[in-house]
């Protein structure tokens, strides 16, 4: 009996040392060596300081910035500590009302957009922190952003086109635009930040 207890303790301690110590150190070291930016959360640096992440959406509200997808993460959205969707089903009246309110707000913000609204601009992502919008979601905002920044519409539209990323490995997913990267490029094009965030 004592032998079994000792063997169990030895195995437990060895596995704890291996799985709680050696394995995490090895994986972290390999990630830092092979993919240092991605291993640290894909930070986006501006003037030597972290401004955001390529992987986590931010809430932009100013008329001079492109806005991301709606977020259901946390009470006010975009709360990384409360990542998650609304969990509302397709028959939910609450979801239908939220989508209608978002659609009305989008039409009010972007009155020049006459095409149907892109679905990603009225629906929250599963994580609530999606950093991307569809190319159509960015295109619908071009006139508003250009007017707020005093830029030619063609220049802003070209900037959107330059920031469209294709599917991963050419097969997985849809074309998309990283909103943070697009807004930083917009700041560079316009020569500074706009009012709002």
Curated annotation (Swiss-Prot):
It holds the Pfam family KdpC. One of its GO terms (cellular component) is plasma membrane. Keywords: ATP-binding, Cell inner membrane, Cell membrane, Ion transport, Membrane, Nucleotide-binding, Potassium, Potassium transport, Transmembrane, Transmembrane helix, Transport. It comes from the Bacteria. Its main location: membrane. GO terms for molecular function: ATP binding; P-type potassium transmembrane transporter activity. InterPro entries: KdpC (IPR003820). It is found in: Cell inner membrane. The chain crosses the membrane at residues 9-29. It is a single-pass membrane protein. Belongs to the KdpC family. Part of the high-affinity ATP-driven potassium transport (or Kdp) system, which catalyzes the hydrolysis of ATP coupled with the electrogenic transport of potassium into the cytoplasm. This subunit acts as a catalytic chaperone that increases the ATP-binding affinity of the ATP-hydrolyzing subunit KdpB by the formation of a transient KdpB/KdpC/ATP ternary complex. The system is composed of three essential subunits: KdpA, KdpB and KdpC. NCBIfam families: kdpC, PRK00315.1. This is Potassium-transporting ATPase KdpC subunit.
């Amino acid at each position: 009996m004592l032998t079994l207890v000792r063997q169990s303790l030895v195995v437990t301690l060895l596995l704890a040392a291996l799985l709680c110590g050696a394995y995490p150190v090895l994986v972290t070291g390999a990630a830092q060596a092979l993919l240092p930016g991605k291993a640290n959360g894909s930070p986006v640096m501006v003037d030597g300081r972290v401004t955001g992440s390529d992987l986590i959406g931010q809430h932009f509200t100013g008329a001079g910035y492109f806005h991301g997808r709606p977020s259901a993460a946390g009470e006010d959205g975009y709360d990384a500590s409360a990542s998650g969707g609304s969990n509302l089903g397709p028959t939910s009246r609450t979801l239908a009302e939220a989508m209608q309110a978002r659609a009305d707000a989008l039409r009010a913000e972007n009155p020049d957009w006459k095409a149907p609204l892109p679905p990603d601009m009225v629906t929250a992502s599963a994580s609530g922190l999606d950093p991307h919008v569809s190319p159509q979601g960015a295109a619908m905002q071009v006139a508003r952003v250009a007017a707020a920044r005093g830029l030619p519409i063609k220049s802003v539209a070209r900037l959107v086109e330059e920031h469209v990323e294709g599917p991963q490995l050419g097969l997985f997913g849809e074309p998309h635009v990283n909103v943070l990267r697009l807004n930083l490029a917009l700041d560079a094009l316009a020569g500074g930040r706009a009012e709002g965030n």
